[in-house]
Swiss-Prot record:
Negative regulator of class I heat shock genes (grpE-dnaK-dnaJ and groELS operons). Prevents heat-shock induction of these operons. GO terms for biological process: negative regulation of DNA-templated transcription. Changing A320T: In strain: E/UW-5/Cx. GO terms for molecular function: DNA binding. Pfam families: HrcA (PF01628). The keyword Nucleotide-binding does not apply. InterPro entries: GAF-like_dom_sf (IPR029016), HrcA (IPR002571), HrcA_C (IPR021153), WH-like_DNA-bd_sf (IPR036388), WH_DNA-bd_sf (IPR036390). Belongs to the HrcA family. Keywords: Repressor, Stress response, Transcription, Transcription regulation. This is Heat-inducible transcription repressor HrcA. The lineage of its organism: Bacteria, Pseudomonadati, Chlamydiota, Chlamydiia, Chlamydiales.
Amino acid sequence: MENRIEMSQLRASKKDSKISYVLLMATKLYLEGGQPVGSKLLKETYCSDLSSATIRNYFAQLETDGFLRKNHISGGRIPTDLAFRYYADHNAPFLEQEEILAIQQKLTELPEYSKNIVKDLQKASEVLSDILQLPVCFSSPRFESDSVINIQLVAIDDQRVVFVLSTEFGQVFTDVLWLPEQLPENSLKRIEGFLQNYLRKQPSDSLLSQKEKDLGMVLYNEVVVRYLTRYCHFSEEDLYQTGLSRLLKYETFKDPETLAQGLAFFENRKHMCQLLNTYLHKETPTAFIGRELTDIVGNTDPSCAVITIPYYMDRTPLGAFGVLGPMNLPYQQVFGTLSLFTERLKVILTQSFYKFKLSFRRPCPTDPRCSQRPAELTRSSSIKLLPAKELS
């Protein structure tokens, strides 16, 4: 992002390395305990070579520079988003050996290479969310030569049904269909069976009435048109998310307004796609903290942090994972975990792409060639409209 916070704001980091160290250690202590940091506690833990008076003087300068704020109850200091940014930028990813072993064991739950690539990515996001105990989202391109393998109909009420269309690569499309009249449940099941049999080129149920068959053909064409519309017109990445309820265990998000702001940002497809694409060709994690998110969200300060990292097939980025959390995240551990995770995922995806000869396409909302692309994509789709003679 063009206007990310410049660390030159911390004037003392150039003049005196000690004040920089005090800031880093105060932030580290706050991340460890979650409580305002006093000069006495900081001296006892990480700054034994400095007097309490010197630490207080440094605290005062850091307050002036906007890196710390005073807690009016205890008198201790709390890091601001500038402090968390400085901490994230000046600490390499770090995991204890036992943490690495635990994460590697958890990563064995990732699926092996397969053709069901979207489902595998969704499973991977569940594993990552479980490891970090944080909400996770990821962006995904569309994979070519995908095949529709199933259609399901689920009744909502007397005249509306949801159709669920699933593909070989794990994509799922849903929409609502309107029935011309109320149908018995067993009739809807027979129509669903007709759609599935037609899709798989199998004979239809002998119990299917002509009226049910006619309705089935109309519904089939409606499903196909809606699917092809979404399949061909691809203006932004597909976005998947999980683990939103994990935010509730963090003190920051027990405030309803803060929780609503964080979730509103995470749920906004446009904002998240923009954020995930910002550093798509950077192989290391990137943190967006507090006010750094404001340019994407608008005037609202979301008081949270999002950490992103792209995932690769060989040397080609396919999309990115994003992690949402409070600003006081353990950045070193989160960065280290994301690096281990994407390294393992890269191996799996590379094997899948080469074994099954997969290809993909990205959104092209402004590409003039896109206007010619739908016809080509429609011809290559595995699902077709019924011939006119079958509808007569």
